[in-house]
From Swiss-Prot:
Gene assigned in the entry: rsmH
One Gene Ontology term from the biological process aspect of the record: rRNA base methylation
Source species: Francisella philomiragia subsp. philomiragia (strain ATCC 25017 / CCUG 19701 / FSC 153 / O#319-036)
Protein name as catalogued: Ribosomal RNA small subunit methyltransferase H
Molecular function terms, GO-annotated: rRNA (cytosine-N4-)-methyltransferase activity
NCBIfam families xrefs: 16S rRNA (cytosine(1402)-N(4))-methyltransferase RsmH
InterPro entries: RsmH (IPR002903), SAM-dep_MeTrfase_MraW_recog (IPR023397), SAM-dependent_MTases_sf (IPR029063)
Reactions listed under catalytic activity: cytidine(1402) in 16S rRNA + S-adenosyl-L-methionine = N(4)-methylcytidine(1402) in 16S rRNA + S-adenosyl-L-homocysteine + H(+)
Origin: domain of life: Bacteria
Pfam name, any one: Methyltransf_5
Subcellular localization(s) per the UniProt record: Cytoplasm
Taxonomic lineage: Bacteria, Pseudomonadati, Pseudomonadota, Gammaproteobacteria, Thiotrichales
Amino acid sequence: MICMHFSVLLQESIADLNINPEGIYIDATFGRGGHSKAILDKLTSGRLIAFDKDLDAIDYATHNFQNDNFEMVHASFTYIYDYCLQHNLLGRVDGIIMDLGVSSPQLDNANRGFSFTHDGPLDMRMDISKGLTASQALEELSVDELTYIFKVYGEERFAKKIALRIKGYIAENGSITTTHQLAELIRATIGKREKKNPATRCFQALRIYVNDELKDLEILLESILDVIKKGGRVAAISFHSLEDRIVKQKFTSLINPKQETNRIAKMLPQDNSQVKMKWITKKAKANQDELSQNVRSRSAILRVVEKL
C-alpha cells in the first residue's frame, strides 16, 4: 500500500529552527522523513541524525536517504542522550525536531493495528520487534488497570464500563485480536454519542500504553538542555492534549521556573539564573491551506524554544 504522508506544520517548524547550514540537527521522530528532508535541504557541511523505532521507517530511510551527512538510528528518542554522550555531541546540537504521535503511514497500514478505520491485527506497537501487542495487553491488564488507562490516556468518561465489557468478553470468548473487534465492542458498550468514532479515545489510550509514549516523551524532554548548545532550538509538534500538556509544562518550567513552584515563590522577583530557555513560538496551529490538504493537522500544536 502506498500512503501519502504530509509532514504537519513543516514550513513553520523548519523556519523556527533557524537552520545553520553547518550545524548538527536531530530528528527525534523520522517517520517518512518530511522534516528530515527539509533540514537536509538547508545543510551544507552540517549533519542530521534521525531516530525512529519503527522498522518501516528505517526501511524507508535506507532506500530514500543516501546523504553522506545523514545517519538513521533504529531506536526510541529516549536514546538520544546516550547517543550524544557516546558520540561527544552533548551541548553541541543546534536543533531538535520532534513530531509526536502516530504517522499517516502507520494509521493507513491495516497490519499495524493503529486504526479502527481498517480491520487488521490488534498490534499497535511502534517497534514490532519487541513488547506486548495491544491484544496481549488487553488480556494481561486488570479491569482497574484498563479503566485507568482509558480514563487517563484517553480521557474516556465511560472508562470503567468499557473495561468491564472488554474483560468480560475476553473471559467468555477469548482474545480480542482485530481492530474491528475492539472498535465494535466499544461501540456496542457506549453507543455513538458524538461525531467521532466512539472507539477513538480508547484506541489512543491503548496505543499510548503499549508504546509508553508519555513516559518516553518526559525522558526526551528531560535531556534536551544537555543535548543542545546555547542558541540551539527545540521544536515539538503534538497532536493531543496529553502530549501538549507535557511539552508545555516542561518548556514553561525552563522559561519561567517560578510558575512551577508555590504561590509565595510566584510573588518573588524572577531569578534569571534559573531561566534556561526562551519562547520562539509559544503556540502555533496549522493554517487553512494545510488543513484543506491534511485533515489530520487540525489538532497539531507547534511549540518552539531556544536555549539561553
